[in-house]
Amino acid sequence: MSQITVADISRWQGTINWDQFKGAVSGVVIKATGADGGLYTDGMLAYNRDRARERGVPIWFYHYKGSGNARQEAEYFVNAIGGLRAGEALVLDDENEGKVNVAWDAEFADHIKELIFRLRFNGIHIYTK
């Protein structure tokens, strides 16, 4: 079995030299949003997303779970990313130290699926005459 190295990237790592970083990892998990203390977008999301895409580094985006409304957090998360590309995935970071709320997580995941379906199929419009 080969080893896969995936790095957790957020504003806490500062500005990454993606040219050096590219060959060191198999992929990255980029923090997109969080809700610990209110909804927010990670300050380095756009930079990290764009640099990873430019260099062909596989990306998974994550949302750091808060304790608010699951549907609202899911919507904020999807909107902040600005669209997914082929092969990119979404991840929920649930670090409630053994107190996982399965119903909340399921509602979040269900709404993510609804949003992705709506974005994929409502994002293409054809007008003909």
Residue spans of the language-model regions?
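Acidic carboxylate-rich catalytic motifs and surrounding loops in phosphoryl-/glycosyl-chemistry enzymes
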Residues: I126-K129
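Substrate-binding cleft of extracellular glycoside hydrolase catalytic domains
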Residues: S2-G123
